[in-house]
């Protein structure tokens, strides 16, 4: 079992969350499209050669983002990452994937 985390501009969060669930992540027992979100501020500065959706080259940018977390089976990770990248507006999609411990330590 894995946890997939994506950082998404707030205005795009519902679209990305739906894509994640449609790809098969976020299944907990008899529930699907399950996720947890928190809001925060994302910061970045586009470098020369970037094609930013938001902001300008060499100018620091701040944007309100949602951290979307979902549980994901190993066989759904590739489809989930593909779905996130397809629905996400950023050129470089901020993603984290963690393997979860299967038993209590």
Please name every model-derived segment:
Residues 1-105:
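Hydrophobic structural segments
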């Amino acid at each position: 079992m894995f946890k997939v985390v994506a950082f998404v501009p707030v205005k795009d969060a519902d679209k990305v969350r739906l894509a994640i669930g449609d790809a098969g992540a976020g299944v907990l027992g008899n529930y699907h499209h399950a996720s947890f979100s928190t809001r925060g501020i994302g910061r970045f500065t586009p470098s020369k050669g970037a094609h930013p959706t938001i902001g300008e080259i060499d100018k620091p940018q701040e944007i309100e983002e949602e951290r979307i977390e979902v549980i994901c089976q190993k066989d759904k990770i590739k489809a989930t990452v593909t779905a996130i990248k397809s629905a996400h507006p950023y050129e470089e999609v901020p993603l984290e994937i963690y393997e979860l411990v299967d038993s209590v330590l």
